[in-house]
From Swiss-Prot:
Segments traversing the membrane: none
The species this protein was found in: Saccharomyces cerevisiae (strain ATCC 204508 / S288c) (Baker's yeast)
Residue ranges annotated for the BPL/LPL catalytic domain, each copy included: 108-312
Family per record: Belongs to the LipB family.
Domain of life: Eukaryota
Pathway: Protein modification; protein lipoylation via endogenous pathway; protein N(6)-(lipoyl)lysine from octanoyl-[acyl-carrier-protein]: step 1/2
Gene name of the record: LIP2
Pfam families: LplA-B_cat (PF21948)
Disulfide-bonded cysteines: none
Annotated Gene Ontology cellular component terms: mitochondrion
Catalysis: reaction(s): octanoyl-[ACP] + L-lysyl-[protein] = N(6)-octanoyl-L-lysyl-[protein] + holo-[ACP] + H(+)
Protein name: Octanoyltransferase, mitochondrial
Function of the protein: Catalyzes the transfer of endogenously produced octanoic acid from octanoyl-acyl-carrier-protein onto the lipoyl domains of lipoate-dependent enzymes. Lipoyl-ACP can also act as a substrate although octanoyl-ACP is likely to be the physiological substrate.
Principal subcellular localisation of the protein: mitochondrion
Site for Lowers pKa of active site Cys, residues: K238
């Protein structure tokens, strides 16, 4: 079942981060803006039931593949038109019907999409450790079950194509995947997308309501450091991990925010390659708050929409993960 809700609403990392942050500081509303009509509406697919990590990865890859397939078709058309122009020395013509079809194909560009999930316990390995992870290390992750998590499935280890090293996804954590074409936004390289994700997370931790019955915000004082991610307690504890992947300007992966996660899943191991670093959660920082992964998901997507300069947000709440299965 699903429900649809419509709302209005650099090559050098350090240089890019400063430039993007400066934009954010001087104009709180946005860090970029759409330059293509397709990017003017953002679609939020909000999965409301906990699912296996691989299922979420499969959904993400299906949507990314659709974006890439459209790019492939458009590139082939462009190459063919150039070839015809060269062969006929600028005299080649196409009839009106062919032109209408080609114009429609060339105008096809998917909207930006944000997927939000809560996953079963999973450790994921980024590209940095793809060739160095040993069977013994994987076994250690997959055999770890906190005393309070006996009713949850045993953790799995999954290799993924995002940047970074090992991180954890599981109950009490909202995982947010951002699928968009960087070229449909003004001056928006991948490193600036990372900065945008971090700032959206910081604003989420500050502005999300303590509970449904009050307008009082969490007002968590979060920040960025020299290490990617979002931190609290003056940079001593990490509350959100960030990692993206880009193929032909199409992005995937994004951010994981710890809401009421069992922190022993992360603090019993070295996460993200950061030694002597502790992970925290919203509930550890604000034990009197009544928030859940879904309220944080909605809050983050609103903040990200503003920072992207997008005016229209459409949300589809999905409680049946099989709704996106391909027809046989």
């Amino acid at each position: 079942m699903s429900r649809c809700i419509r709302q209005s609403v650099c090559t050098n990392f350090n240089v890019c981060r400063r430039q993007c942050f400066s934009t954010y500081a001087s104009a709180l509303k946005e860090m970029t803006h759409p330059i293509k009509p397709s990017a003017q509406t953002l679609r939020h697919l909000q999965f409301t039931q906990r699912i296996p990590f691989q299922k979420g990865l499969e959904i993400q890859e299906t949507l990314v593949r659709a974006n890439l397939d459209i790019k492939d078709i458009q590139s082939k058309i462009e190459r063919k038109l150039i070839q015809l122009d060269e062969e006929y020395k600028g005299t080649a013509t196409i009839n009106d019907n062919e032109k209408r079809i080609l114009d429609k194909v060339m105008a096809m560009k998917p909207n930006p999409i944000i997927l939000t999930f809560e996953f079963e316990p999973t450790y994921t390995g980024g590209k940095r450790i793809k060739k160095t992870m040993t069977p013994d290390q994987i076994a250690a992750y997959e055999s770890f079950i906190p005393e309070t998590q006996k009713d949850n499935p045993r953790p799995k280890f999954v290799q993924v194509e995002r940047g970074g090293q090992v991180t954890f996804h599981g109950p009490g954590q909202i995982v947010i995947y951002i699928i968009l074409d960087l070229k449909t936004f003004q001056s928006f390289p991948a490193k600036c997308l990372v900065s945008c994700i971090e700032q959206a997370t910081i604003r989420t931790l500050k502005n999300t309501k303590m509970c449904d019955d009050t307008d009082k915000p969490l007002n968590l004082d979060a920040m960025t450091t020299k290490d990617t991610g979002v931190w609290v307690e003056n940079g001593k504890k990490k509350v959100a991990s960030v990692g993206i992947h880009v193929r032909r300007s199409i992005t995937s992966h994004g951010v994981a925010i710890n809401v009421n996660t069992d922190l022993s899943y992360m603090n019993s191991f070295e996460m993200c390659g950061l030694k002597n670093t502790l992970t925290t959660s919203i509930m550890e920082q604000r034990p009197d708050a009544v928030v859940n992964v879904q309220s944080v998901a909605i809050s983050f997507v609103k903040e990200m929409t503003k920072l992207l300069g997008i005016k229209t947000l459409e949300r589809m709440q999905i409680d049946d993960v099989n709704i996106l299965k391909k027809n046989p």
